[in-house]
Structure formats: structure tokens, C-alpha cells
Amino acid sequence: MKTYFIIIHLLVCNILIASLFPLSVHSSTPEIKIGSKKFTESVIMGEIVTDLIKSTGEQPVYLRELGGTRVLWNALVKGEIDIYPEYTGTISEEILAGEGVHSEEEIRQALTRHGIEMTKALGFNNTYAIGMKKQVAEELNIQKISDLCHYPNLKFGFGNEFMDRGDGWPALRKSYNLPQENVRGLDHDLAYRGLEKGTIQAIDIYSTDAKIKYYDLRILEDDLNHFPLYNAVILYRSDLEERVPHVVTVLKKLESIIHESEMIKMNSRANLEMVPENQIASDFLLENLSLETEFYEETAFGRL
């Protein structure tokens, strides 16, 4: 009889626990983790993806500004994150360098071998470019990258990643036979300051960078077509198609809807008007997908 009451007591306790903590019973799906790189555009796209996935009822974790390309890629392959925004040029020239992939289909097949899938292009090409102050370029009559060959004493300031990547400075120099020796690797913000002060004359920039207009820069024509297309895409783990197929479906809603002018506008709001990236993402989804999202006011503690 005593044993009977103990069993009844345990059953009642289990029912109470299940009613108080229903999530612990039903949350068998591992949480979805989204990453982004340490620059504004990647952070904004990560916010857009996060809000979009939340609209499915999932509660993804957004790990913003994790690091550079290798950090994000390795985390994706290892399963430490499930999704992050990337560019086709970075995939072919850096991540899969040496595998001889160039077309979108070749990239897609190579990624699948790593257990990774890729959406179609989101709608804008954020290629690398070389920029100069417009006034300096006009004074020297520099219109295209090959014109730099006539000015060996010009000083260049390139981002550290550009100094090392497959289509970066070493390859650019070889493609155009550029004679410049005074080339420094530095942070992008310092490069812009160098342009303003006149201590450097050319920098690498992204073609959707909001600071192009702000600093009145001239984008030099890539007349030898050195830089590949950097079409924005979303990379995600192949196992998401079985784990959470509705998440993969909603990711594809971003295909072909973020145009270059729209991305420049979003970058400008973040970098020049200091609008929080999550507010920008929320506005974009409302305007383009009629999706209302919960905007939270970011604080210093919110970034920790």
C-alpha cells in the first residue's frame, strides 16, 4: 500500500513539473545559432536573418561580430553556428581557394561536400574596389586601376584581410604589374583617416560602403576585371533542411530582394546616422516583406 502511494505521488509530481515547464518537455530541436563578421553590413544582414527566423516561432541565438572569414567558416563547418551571411567571391577566392571553383554552380557543389548549403544571391554585389579621394584622382587623371602604374610613389593603405586574401594586394599587384612599394596593412577606419590627412592616396573599399559618398571618393575602374563578383548569399548547414526545413524556406525569402542601393542606404544609416543595426533590420523587413518584428533598444550591456 505504501508503495502504491509513492508511485501516485511521483506521477503527480511529474505532471506538475511538465505543466510548469512545458518547454523542457518539447524543446528537442537544438537552438539555431547565427553568426556575422566584424563589419556593419554583415551585422545588419545577421540581424535581418535573426528576425526572419524568429517569425517562424524559433528563438535563434545571434552571435554578432564573431570575427573574420576563417573564424565564421570554421564555426559553421564544426556546427558551432548554423547560418551566416557571406559573399560568393570570398567563398571562391578564400574559403575554397585552390579548389578551382568559379561559377555559382561549382561553388554550390563544393560547399555541399563540406556539409554546407548556399541560398541564391540576395540581390547585390559588394565587390572589392580601389578608392581615392576624388580631388586627388582628378588632379592625377586617374580613372582606372591600371592608371596607378604611372605613379609609383603613391602610398596605399589596405585592410589587413585584403593584404592576405587570394584576390587581395599580392594578386592585384601581379595582375596590374603595380610598382608601388609603400603599402601598409591597417584598420579600415585608419585608412579613411589617412585619406583625409593625405598620408595615403588609395585604399581598398567595399562597393556598398556608405563612406564612399561621405568621403567623396572615386572608385577606380577594374579595367582588367581582377575582382570576382561578391554576390551576397546566406550559408547554412545542410542538416538544417532536416532539422528545421521551415527555417531554410524562410531564408530563401531574402533571395533577390536586397538591391545595392538598399544596402548602401542601410550601411549609411548605421555608419553615418548611428541607427542601431537591429532597428535597420526591422525597418527593412517591414518595408520589403511586410513583417513586423520586435525591436529592442540596444544598450552597452546588450552587446556583452
Where are these regions (language model features)?
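A bilobed periplasmic-binding-protein/Venus flytrap-type ligand-binding module shared by bacterial periplasmic
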Residues: 127-138, 231-244
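Alpha-to-beta junction loops
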Residues: 77-86, 152-155, 171, 190, ...
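N-terminal hydrophobic or amphipathic helices and topogenic motifs
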Residues: 2-5, 9-61, 65-67, 263-304
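Extracytoplasmic
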Residues: 29, 67, 78, 113, ...
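Soluble extramembrane regions of membrane proteins in the secretory/endomembrane system
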Residues: 176, 206-208, 236-237, 249, ...
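Ligand-binding "clamshell"
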Residues: 95-119, 199, 211-225
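Bilobed "Venus flytrap"/periplasmic-binding protein-like clamshell domains
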Residues: 31-61, 123-193, 275, 279
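Beta->alpha turn/N-cap motifs
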Residues: 65-69, 79-92, 103, 133, ...
